[in-house]
Amino acid sequence: MAVPKRKMSRANTRHRRSQWKASAPTLVQCSNRACREPKLPHVACPSCGQYDGRQIHEPA
C-alpha cells in the first residue's frame, strides 16, 4: 500500500478537495403533453405519475 512521504499541508489538502463538486441533477420534461413538468430521467413523473406513456402511480 502506498504511504505518503511527507505530511500534506492544509493549503494543498484544501486545494485538492476544492475540485470535489456536486453536480446539479439533469432534468428533462415529462413526456405527458398535459404535464410537461421537469423530472429526473428514467424516473416516473412525481406530478402526474406517468412513466414511458403508462400510468405508474396516482398523481401527488
UniProtKB/Swiss-Prot annotation:
Give the protein name, as stated in the record: Large ribosomal subunit protein bL32B
Q: Where is the composition biased (Basic residues)?
A: 1-19
Q: Name one GO molecular function term.
A: structural constituent of ribosome
Q: Where is this region: Disordered?
A: 1-20
Alphabetical list of SUPFAM superfamilies matching this protein: Zn-binding ribosomal proteins
Q: Which family does it belong to?
A: Belongs to the bacterial ribosomal protein bL32 family.
Membrane-crossing residue ranges in chain numbering: none
The organism's taxonomic lineage, starting at the top: Bacteria, Bacillati, Actinomycetota, Actinomycetes, Pseudonocardiales
GO CC, sorted alphabetically, is:
large ribosomal subunit
GO-annotated biological processes: translation
Q: Which UniProt keywords apply?
A: Ribonucleoprotein, Ribosomal protein
What the entry lists under PANTHER family is as follows:
50S RIBOSOMAL PROTEIN L32, LARGE RIBOSOMAL SUBUNIT PROTEIN BL32
